[in-house]
């Protein structure tokens, strides 16, 4: 017998922060009659999704991975950025077994140590301080051939800001007496997560064969040439950097390759291209037999040594719902599917018992400002059908538009993205009302509320540290002030009448009026 459910839905509006300054604020300038009405009629407030409140350094902007881990776990989770930075400052990093083994294996084989990753101070997918520590450690252990393959940012940092980083590493290698920048390429290619293998293949061929669209004798020169081609950091074409003899550095048998990104979602595809024996994303001309190490755990099927394995999170929202015999649905587009599943479940790949998942393909466009609505209509069609089925106790949905279009820096497109999401929310709220359901509307971090850098005048493509909305569309209630993302899971459990496990240190924010 099927039991009719009155679901509670958590709608996560990715990249949707609150900013009082209305200048180039796409969320403010968007026509959002649905959210305006909900804010007027229902209890609402603002909660924190950045810095110490989500386990990041004070003042550090939030991001989707961190946001969803905190949302799903119901506690502040000490993030990889903070954890690894602490290991470096405590001098534990330089004796990390996985990293030391990789460096030593290359030295003993007469090979090179290749270090790849997002060379950025952004702190979202990586941090250049970690990459510097790795370069220093490799040379200190005796490596004389150290090659940095730099993926350029311009997304979590200003669009043209890589010069300072590249110059710093040129100086660093000069100081160390060994090593150099061996290649540069934009993250658009190297860090794709939407199965655009034609992009990833360019980074793979650059590192394994030195196959590049351009070749230069200096990384900064290569970057300046890219700017002259009107390529921002994120989109810099594959560029090989030669040594004084005009030779490129390629990954060879016996070498070590250390991937310094700590965030998993954009590290998975290129990692699989290097290590999976049955990889079929593109034709690999060469597959070097090398020692590959990942900085953190990227996925269950990636079996390379891990320098900093994931810390086990127990009694996340998904696990509690499973243990209490509850049903749940996770739904999003490709771009944020991993976030409502893997990250929301505290880094667990497999679904919990009673957990269904729906993946909606994100549109195949070069950048999402070309289709700011993305696949929101199709996503909402499936979501409304799931609500009407009365099959689920809890539904977790992510609308990626504010973040993905916000990252393009295109203000007009970001406005359209917000308007598309608002229309979809109207359909979802209506469907929930028909079945007696309720919903919480919030976000994981800010982005679209700031589309220009007030200091430089450049497009602002990064996340922000702004507070995010928290709206309860349901029974008459009050909402506590000063909340944070880790308070959301306990709030949901309380709303459905379940006790909150001790591991969840967050506090329920919603108090139903009797």
Curated annotation (Swiss-Prot):
**Pathway(s) of this molecule:** Carbohydrate degradation; glycolysis; pyruvate from D-glyceraldehyde 3-phosphate: step 3/5
Q: Please provide, alphabetically and separated by semicolons, the GO molecular function terms listed in this UniProt record.
A: manganese ion binding; phosphoglycerate mutase activity
Q: Which residues form the active site?
A: 64 (phosphoserine intermediate)
> For this protein, what is the EC number?
5.4.2.12
| Amino-acid positions noted as binding Mn(2+) 2 in the UniProt annotation, renumbered to this chain | 14, 64, 444-445
Q: Does the keyword Manganese apply?
A: yes
Cofactor details (free text) = Binds 2 manganese ions per subunit.
Whether Metal-binding counts among this entry's keywords is yes
CC cofactor: Mn(2+)
Identify the keywords attached in UniProt to this record, alphabetized. Answer: Glycolysis, Isomerase, Manganese, Metal-binding
Q: Which GO terms describe its biological process?
A: glucose catabolic process; glycolytic process
Which function does this protein serve?
Catalyzes the interconversion of 2-phosphoglycerate and 3-phosphoglycerate.
Quote the protein name from its UniProt record: 2,3-bisphosphoglycerate-independent phosphoglycerate mutase
Q: Which gene encodes it?
A: gpmI
């Amino acid at each position: 017998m099927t039991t009719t459910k009155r679901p509670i839905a958590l709608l996560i509006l990715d990249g949707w922060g609150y900013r009082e300054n209305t200048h180039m604020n796409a969320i403010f300038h968007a026509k959002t009659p649905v959210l305006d009405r909900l804010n007027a009629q229902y209890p609402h407030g603002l909660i924190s999704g950045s810095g110490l409140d989500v386990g990041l350094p004070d003042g550090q902007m939030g991001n989707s991975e961190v946001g969803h881990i905190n949302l799903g776990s119901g506690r502040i989770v000490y993030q990889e950025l903070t954890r690894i930075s602490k290991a470096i400052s405590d001098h534990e990093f330089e004796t990390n077994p996985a990293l030391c083994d990789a460096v030593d294996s290359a030295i003993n084989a007469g090979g090179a140590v290749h270090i790849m990753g997002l060379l950025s101070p952004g702190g979202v997918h990586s941090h250049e301080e970690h990459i510097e520590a790795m370069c220093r450690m490799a040379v200190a252990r005796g490596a004389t051939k150290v090659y940095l393959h730099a993926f350029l940012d311009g997304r979590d940092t200003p669009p043209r800001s890589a010069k300072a980083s590249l110059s710093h590493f040129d100086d660093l290698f000069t100081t160390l007496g060994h090593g150099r920048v061996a290649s540069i390429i934009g993250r658009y290619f190297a860090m794709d997560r939407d199965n655009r293998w034609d992009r990833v293949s360019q980074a793979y061929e650059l590192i394994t064969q030195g196959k590049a669209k351009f070749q230069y004798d200096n990384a900064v020169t290569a970057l300046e040439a890219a700017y002259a081609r009107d390529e921002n950091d994120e989109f810099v074409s594959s560029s090989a950097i030669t040594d004084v003899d005009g030779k490129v550095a390629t990954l060879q048998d016996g070498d070590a390759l250390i991937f310094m990104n700590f965030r998993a979602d954009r590290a998975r595809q290129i990692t699989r291209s290097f290590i999976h024996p049955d990889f079929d994303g593109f034709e690999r001309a060469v597959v070097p037999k090398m020692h590959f190490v990942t900085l953190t755990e990227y996925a269950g099927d990636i079996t390379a040594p891990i320098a900093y394995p994931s810390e086990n999170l127990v009694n996340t929202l998904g696990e509690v719902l499973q243990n209490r015999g509850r049903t749940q649905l996770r739904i999003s587009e490709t771009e944020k599917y991993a976030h409502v599943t893997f990250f929301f479940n505290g880094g667990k790949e497999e679904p919990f018992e009673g957990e269904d998942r729906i993946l909606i393909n994100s549109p195949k466009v070069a950048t999402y400002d070309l289709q700011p609505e993305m696949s929101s209509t199709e996503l909402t069609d499936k979501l409304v059908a799931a609500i009407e089925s009365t099959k689920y106790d809890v539904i977790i949905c992510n609308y990626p538009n504010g973040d993905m279009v916000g990252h393009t820096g295109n203000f007009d497109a970001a406005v359209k993205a917000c308007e598309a999401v608002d229309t979809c929310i109207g359909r979802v709220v209506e469907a929930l009302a028909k079945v007696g359901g309720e919903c919480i509307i919030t976000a994981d971090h800010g982005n679209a509320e700031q589309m220009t850098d007030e200091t430089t005048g450049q497009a602002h493509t990064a996340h922000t540290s702004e507070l995010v909305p928290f709206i309860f569309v349901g029974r008459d209630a009050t909402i506590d002030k000063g909340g944070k993302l880790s308070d959301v899971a306990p709030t949901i459990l309380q709303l459905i009448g379940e006790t909150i496990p001790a591991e969840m240190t967050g506090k329920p924010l919603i108090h139903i009026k009797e």
